[in-house]
From Swiss-Prot:
Protein's UniProt name: Profilin-2
Subunit structure and binding partners: Occurs in many kinds of cells as a complex with monomeric actin in a 1:1 ratio.
Species of origin: Betula pendula
Superkingdom of origin: Eukaryota
Disulfide bridge partners, by residue number: C13-C117
Length: 133
């Protein structure tokens, strides 16, 4: 299965059969290389991925400045140290799950809820971890 298939079928899927989906998603290597992304995923700067990776290594690193992706600032909210970073911006937000080799991104807007985004992103991330990726 190609990385793009994971994005198209597992991240940009119909959530709970409700006809809702994430606004954008991607799978990005720890080095910032894009493995696959939705057409709506923002163009990001390498230093933004560096900052995200640093927060996984040193939880709380992004809290004072916020999480930036594609020039958009998200307020960092409770995640799981070293495993999941969550951010909020207005009625939307972002979930990032770290696997052994990749970062799985999900960006949502209402009516998708934070919990739905977390479920979609973390489910794929956990699967990739189980596969040794």
């Amino acid at each position: 299965m190609s990385w793009q298939t994971y994005v198209d079928e597992h991240l940009m899927c119909d959530i709970d059969g409700q006809g809702q989906q994430l606004a954008a998603s991607a799978i990005v290597g720890h080095d910032g290389s894009v493995w696959a992304q939705s057409s709506s995923f923002p163009q990001f700067k390498p230093q933004e991925i560096t900052g995200i990776m640093k927060d996984f290594e040193e939880p709380g690193h992004l809290a004072p400045t916020g999480l930036h992706l594609g020039g958009i600032k998200y307020m960092v909210i409770q995640g799981e140290a070293g495993a999941v970073i969550r951010g909020k911006k207005g009625s939307g937000g972002i979930t990032i799950k770290k696997t052994g080799q990749a970062l799985v991104f999900g960006i949502y807007e209402e009516p998708v809820t934070p919990g739905q985004c977390n479920m979609v992103v973390e489910r794929l991330g956990d699967y990739l971890i189980d596969q040794g990726l």
